[in-house]
């Protein structure tokens, strides 16, 4: 048991969240590089670039230079602990889509992590998607570290950025590093806790020219000139006006330690990675419908937070991403697939480095493993060593955009149904079958999602489909006594459909119609989100 406890204590599982173009994918690459997981940190460049980010593995992502699915990457990271001894952590990094149209996949991924890194663009500050994602983190009181990026560009003042984070996101900021200049005048950062100055070298491998001890170091005046005295004055003001780091407040999701840097130049990234390992919590306890599951429990438990089809077109595979919540996984172990009430032997679980995969011999609480899925595993499914648990808090969100699927070749109807069913089970889209017709209606939280579905249907399933507009304003899951739902279907069945799980959904043609229908059927609940169970 002691080795189980120590293995779990080494784990750090986190996601990176940001608004599009804040530099999240670049930061992901550089974290992997500093962790020794990749040899060359390839930037996401123009459409025809030869190299693509490790975490952007789907063909469409490579074309567009945006992340449209969440990638999972695991790597060991050795750092120097406070006592000077080397300490090795196992880092599980979940790269999430930054584009606003892929938020549902991001929301679900945030249920699988124990902490998150929020990337803020120093030029643009807090942006819309950052606000949405932080609110999802807040629902679970997820600890957040902040990385203010692009210090090599002319941006807003650091004090202004911290004020905006506190005002807009309602979270205390505790600066851990402080920038020396900005843009062309950017010379490095001062570490407030360690009293060290880290100088910036835009041409060096790791972005750092030198590290000097102490603000009073005369070497600082020689290198920085007049900027040295400006820095001393600024740090005095910062120490007086800002919050000092409070680990308890950080772990409660009420305070965020803030680091400054330039990911594209590798600067500040290693400090962030060290902080992630030092400050972020190891795997946390998880709620189920019946009890709390502690990570150090001897028996394995885990839940599916994502399903991805065709990660490798050569394999035509579907992988269920499982967050290990407690205990230890061993290759070949027999687990109860709770929703199916069946015991299955898991022989071919894998760990990930984006699309690269390795067969897993063992995994511990906090790790993410991939389980081959032949159509029986769904989002939210639970695997245990026998206990019939159901983990809570894995959401499905009401779509905001709707399309009707139509085929150019009617002979491909079976392939269309299979493709849409699989993509819906992944959570890439939601599929609805209206009770009153044979149509297939798709729902998504962002309009670009339909482009992704069309692209994947064509390239992975050989189906050329057209998505036409559908007169639907919003969707609500129906909850209530079966007799009450039957009454609603009898009166308004033309607006009722079944979702992929076979649950009844009301597809409202307008918000006025929804309000009137709710008034007519007060004993039926119309739900905007559905817990995936």
Curated annotation (Swiss-Prot):
The keyword GTP-binding applies. Its main location: cytoplasm. One of its GO terms (biological process) is regulation of translational termination. It comes from the Bacteria. PROSITE patterns: G_TR_1 (PS00301), G_TR_2 (PS51722). Pfam families: EF-G_D2 (PF22042), GTP_EFTU (PF00009), RF3_C (PF16658). GO terms for molecular function: GTP binding; GTPase activity; translation release factor activity, codon nonspecific; translation release factor activity, codon specific. Increases the formation of ribosomal termination complexes and stimulates activities of RF-1 and RF-2. It binds guanine nucleotides and has strong preference for UGA stop codons. It may interact directly with the ribosome. The stimulation of RF-1 and RF-2 is significantly reduced by GTP and GDP, but not by GMP. HAMAP family: Rel_fac_3. PANTHER family: PEPTIDE CHAIN RELEASE FACTOR RF3. Belongs to the TRAFAC class translation factor GTPase superfamily. Classic translation factor GTPase family. PrfC subfamily. This is Peptide chain release factor 3. It comes from Cupriavidus pinatubonensis (strain JMP 134 / LMG 1197). The gene is prfC.
């Amino acid at each position: 048991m002691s080795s189980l406890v120590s293995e779990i204590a080494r784990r750090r599982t986190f996601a990176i969240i940001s608004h599009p173009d804040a530099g999240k994918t670049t930061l992901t690459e550089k974290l992997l590089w500093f962790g020794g997981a990749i040899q060359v940190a390839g930037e996401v460049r123009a459409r025809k670039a030869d190299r693509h980010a490790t975490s952007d593995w789907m063909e469409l992502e490579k074309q567009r230079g945006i992340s449209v699915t969440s990638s999972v990457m695991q790597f060991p990271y050795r750092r120097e602990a406070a006592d000077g001894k080397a300490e090795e952590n196992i880092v599980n990094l979940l790269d999430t889509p930054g584009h606003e149209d892929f938020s549902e996949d991001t929301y679900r991924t945030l249920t699988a992590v124990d902490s998150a890194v929020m990337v803020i663009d120093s030029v643009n500050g807090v942006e819309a998607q950052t606000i949405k994602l932080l609110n999802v983190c807040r629902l679970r009181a997820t600890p957040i570290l902040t990385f203010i990026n692009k210090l090599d560009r002319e941006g807003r003042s650091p004090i202004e950025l911290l004020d905006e984070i506190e005002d807009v996101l309602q979270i205390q900021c505790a600066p851990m590093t402080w920038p020396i200049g900005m843009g062309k005048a950017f010379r490095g950062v001062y570490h407030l806790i360690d009293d060290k100055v880290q100088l910036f070298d835009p041409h060096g491998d790791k972005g750092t020219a030198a590290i000097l001890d102490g603000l009073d170091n005369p070497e600082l005046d020689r290198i920085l000139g007049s900027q040295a005295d400006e820095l001393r004055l600024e740090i005095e003001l910062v120490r007086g006006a800002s919050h000092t780091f409070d680990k308890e407040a950080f772990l409660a999701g009420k305070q965020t330690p803030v680091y400054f840097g330039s990911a594209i130049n590798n600067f500040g990234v290693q400090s962030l990675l060290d902080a992630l390992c030092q400050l972020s919590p190891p795997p946390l306890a998880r709620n189920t419908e019946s009890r709390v599951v502690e990570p150090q429990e001897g028996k394995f438990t885990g839940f599916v937070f994502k399903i991805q089809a065709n990660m490798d077109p050569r394999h035509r595979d579907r992988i269920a991403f499982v967050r290990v919540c407690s205990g230890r996984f061993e290759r070949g172990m027999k687990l109860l697939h709770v929703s199916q009430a069946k015991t299955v032997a898991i022989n071919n679980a894998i760990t990930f480095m984006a699309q690269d995969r390795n067969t897993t011999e063992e995994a511990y609480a906090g790790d993410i493993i991939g389980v081959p899925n032949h159509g029986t595993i769904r989002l939210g499914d639970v695997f245990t060593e026998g206990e019939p648990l159901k983990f809570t808090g894995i959401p499905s969100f009401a779509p905001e955009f709707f399309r009707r699927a139509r085929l150019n070749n009617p002979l491909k109807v079976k392939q269309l149904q299979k493709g849409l069913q699989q993509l819906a089970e992944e959570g890439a889209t939601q599929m609805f079958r209206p009770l009153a017709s044979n149509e297939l209606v798709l729902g998504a939280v962002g309009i670009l999602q339909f482009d992704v579905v069309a692209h994947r249907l064509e390239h992975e399933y050989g189906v050329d489909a057209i998505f036409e507009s559908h007169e639907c304003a919003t969707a609500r899951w129906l909850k209530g006594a079966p007799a009450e739902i039957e009454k609603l279907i009898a009166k308004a069945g033309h607006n009722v459909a079944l979702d992929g799980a076979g649950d009844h959904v009301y597809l409202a043609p307008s918000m006025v119609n929804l309000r009137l229908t709710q008034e007519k059927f007060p004993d039926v609940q119309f739900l905007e989100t559905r817990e995936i169970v």
